[in-house]
């Protein structure tokens, strides 16, 4: 558990100080500046990683881990204990402390004890256990926080003590580490205690989808037929992940998943569930999947249209979209919802055949008021070898400080396009 006064003072190194303060943007800016000064030799983020963990800034620690931090280089005494992490209820903190490079630091007896601790929190309920430990009947302050790069958890503060409600996800993680096979029903129950953005939900879905066995598939099928939209939503994500984690499109559970999602798309009435179902078709392009997507091109809910737009990209071996898909992409690139426009532009870029109607519509997005739309349009035009990407990239300028990693992805397509043109220019 984290209590008031858990962190104090300021580290001398600016990167460590930014990590300790919880300033993710500054952390990324400092790493970029170090890259520039050292001509490509990135500053070691390991000390900042340790500082972020000590301050319980788990999202920053997760980012630093992705950017090269080495947990094995941090002495155990400079990290929170595993018991502190479990009590705090942060799945990301537990993940960092049990990283593959330092997992050997914990004997099985300790992992068993931590599993029992996580189960105790989970079974008691975060609020009830927090009240028991603090002895306070005051009002609990609640908020939602980013725990890692992708998932959020609830955070509760009472009598100067702060905890997160990720104990169910931690329990799932520790059981997997210990080789304990949790029942499908229990994993579903843990997921449905939370919402779709919570770590407990995603962790249960991933664990179940990796079980390429009849029992797990039957669980997805049962959820699909449930009257409760929340249960169907979890079933849709689980079915989608069966397809995502398949070794090939010919794998048994991939075939089953695509068939189920395609049929499901014609019958689902809940927009949130429908969007998840359609997202499940985005990496499998075929006539039936395309027809299921096109059925919802004009859906009244933007999230559904975004799923349609994302699913209409064409794989490299088949460059030509159908006439209906072509028209849908033109329509969706002019959608009133910005995220729909971005998804449609991305899919149009996937086609990469120089189609004039598509490239002209992409080029119209270069004047969009939002930079993220302009970036996507530059990238898509470059993939179509359309020279309009070059001037547009020049107008956008270099990636913004703190956003280099993301924006470089979009701009470098135009840079790659420009280099051959420069090489062939008369000298």
Q: Which residues are covered by each model-predicted region?
A:
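TPR-adjacent "capping" and linker segments in tetratricopeptide-repeat scaffold/adaptor proteins
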Residues: 1-10, 188-195, 207-208, 223
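Ankyrin-repeat boundary/"N-cap" motif
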Residues: 8-17, 39-51, 73-86, 106-121, ...
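Structural detector for internal amphipathic alpha-helices that build alpha-solenoid repeat scaffolds
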Residues: 13-20, 46-55, 79-88, 115-116, ...
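Ankyrin repeat structural motif
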Residues: 23-31, 57-66, 90-98, 126-127
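Ankyrin-repeat C-terminal turn/loop position
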Residues: 34-36, 68-70, 101-102
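Amphipathic alpha-helical scaffolding segments comprising HEAT/armadillo-like alpha-solenoid repeats
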Residues: 36, 60, 72, 180-189, ...
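Short inter-helical turns and helix N-cap capping residues of alpha-solenoid HEAT/ARM repeat scaffolds
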Residues: 227-228, 269-270, 300-301, 336-337, ...
């Amino acid at each position: 558990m984290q209590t008031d006064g858990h962190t104090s003072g300021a580290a001398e190194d600016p990167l460590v100080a930014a990590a300790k303060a919880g300033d993710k943007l500054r952390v990324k800016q400092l790493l970029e500046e170090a890259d520039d000064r050292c001509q490509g030799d990135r500053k070691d983020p390991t000390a900042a990683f340790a500082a972020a963990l000590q301050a319980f800034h788990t999202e920053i620690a997760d980012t630093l881990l992705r950017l090269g931090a080495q947990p094995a280089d941090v002495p155990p005494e400079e990290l929170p204990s595993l018991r502190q992490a479990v009590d705090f209820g942060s799945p990301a903190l537990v993940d960092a402390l049990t990283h593959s490079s330092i997992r050997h630091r914990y004997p099985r007896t300790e992992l068993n004890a931590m599993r029992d601790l996580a189960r105790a929190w989970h079974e008691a309920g975060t609020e009830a256990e927090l009240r028991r430990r603090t002895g306070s009947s005051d009002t609990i302050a609640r908020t939602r926080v980013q725990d890692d790069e992708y998932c959020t958890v609830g955070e509760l503060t009472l009598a100067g003590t702060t905890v997160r409600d990720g104990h169910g996800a931690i329990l799932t993680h520790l059981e997997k580490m210990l080789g304990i096979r949790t029942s499908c029903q229990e994993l579903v129950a843990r997921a449905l205690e939370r919402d779709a953005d919570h770590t407990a939900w995603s962790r249960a879905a991933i664990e179940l989808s990796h079980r390429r066995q009849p029992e797990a598939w039957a669980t997805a099928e049962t959820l699909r037929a449930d009257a409760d939209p929340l249960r169907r939503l979890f079933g849709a994500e689980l079915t989608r992940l069966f397809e995502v984690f398949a070794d090939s499109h010919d794998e048994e559970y991939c075939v089953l998943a695509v068939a189920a999602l395609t049929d499901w798309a014609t019958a689902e009435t809940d927009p949130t569930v429908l969007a998840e179902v359609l997202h499940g078709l985005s990496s499998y392009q075929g006539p039936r999947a395309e027809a299921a997507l096109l059925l919802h091109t004009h859906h009244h809910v933007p999230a559904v249209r975004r799923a349609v737009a994302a699913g209409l990209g064409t794989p490299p071996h088949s460059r030509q979209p159908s006439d209906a898909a072509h028209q849908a992409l033109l329509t969706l690139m002019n959608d009133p919802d910005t995220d729909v426009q971005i998804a449609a532009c991305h899919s149009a870029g996937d086609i990469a055949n120089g189609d004039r109607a598509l490239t002209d519509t992409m080029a119209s997005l270069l004047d969009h008021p939002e930079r993220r739309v302009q970036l996507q349009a530059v990238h898509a035009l470059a993939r179509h070898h359309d020279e309009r990407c070059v001037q547009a990239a020049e107008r956008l300028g270099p990636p913004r400080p703190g956003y280099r990693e993301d924006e470089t992805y979009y701009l470098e397509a135009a840079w790659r396009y420009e280099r051959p043109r420069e090489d062939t220019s008369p000298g």
